[in-house]
Amino acid sequence: MAKVQKKPDLSDPKLKAMLKKGMGHNYYGEPAWPNDLLYIFPVVILGSIALCVGLAVLDPAMVGEPADPFATPLEILPEWYLYPVFQILRVVPNKLLGVVLMGSIPLGLMLVPFIENVNKFQNPFRRPVATTVFLFGTLFTLWLGIGATFPIDKSFTLGLF
């Protein structure tokens, strides 16, 4: 027989009272202040900075090929963080529609908190709609960004087909 796990009702006054008293929470272990914030975090931050500086000194990598003012590249690409919107403008036949689609991105991001606001859980596995929308948006943005680096005829298939 399968065991049914009941989800807690966070609007229940009895449960709220128990949580307010401290029931259901762990109060053991090492406190974050001052141990983590004063000792561990600076070590991690300084270690990360030392790693970046050390790698830059040991193996300085070129950011790209040197600029040649007398040769114009065949295709001018924007910075990497603008690849998805550049791909939208490149692929959509009507430029006004492309601008409207780019303007709809912030509007879509503003709607994300309202998609599944009735669900009080924070665990992504208990919020399937919000998790699915987030994963779809992330994969779609990556697909657009990677496609922007290909020629226009191969940008939809990413050169795979």
Swiss-Prot record:
Q: What is its main location?
A: membrane
Per the UniProt record, the source organism is Cyanothece sp. (strain PCC 7425 / ATCC 29141)
Compartmental location: Cellular thylakoid membrane
Q: Which family does it belong to?
A: Belongs to the cytochrome b family. PetD subfamily.
Q: Which GO terms describe its biological process?
A: photosynthetic electron transport chain
Q: Name one GO cellular component term.
A: plasma membrane-derived thylakoid membrane
Q: Which UniProt keywords apply?
A: Electron transport, Membrane, Photosynthesis, Thylakoid, Transmembrane, Transmembrane helix, Transport
Function field: Component of the cytochrome b6-f complex, which mediates electron transfer between photosystem II (PSII) and photosystem I (PSI), cyclic electron flow around PSI, and state transitions.
Q: What is this protein called?
A: Cytochrome b6-f complex subunit 4
Q: Is this entry keyworded ATP-binding?
A: no
Q: Which residues cross the membrane?
A: 37-57, 96-116, 132-152
- GO MF annotation list: electron transporter, transferring electrons within cytochrome b6/f complex of photosystem II activity; electron transporter, transferring electrons within the cyclic electron transport pathway of photosynthesis activity; oxidoreductase activity
* Quaternary context: The 4 large subunits of the cytochrome b6-f complex are cytochrome b6, subunit IV (17 kDa polypeptide, PetD), cytochrome f and the Rieske protein, while the 4 small subunits are PetG, PetL, PetM and PetN. The complex functions as a dimer.
Q: InterPro entries annotated for this entry?
A: Cyt_b/b6_C, Cyt_b/b6_C_sf, Cyt_b6/f_cplx_suIV, Cytochrome_b_C_euk/bac
Extract the PROSITE patterns matched here. CYTB_CTER
What membrane topology does this protein have?
Answer: Multi-pass membrane protein
Asked whether the keyword Electron transport is assigned, the reply is yes
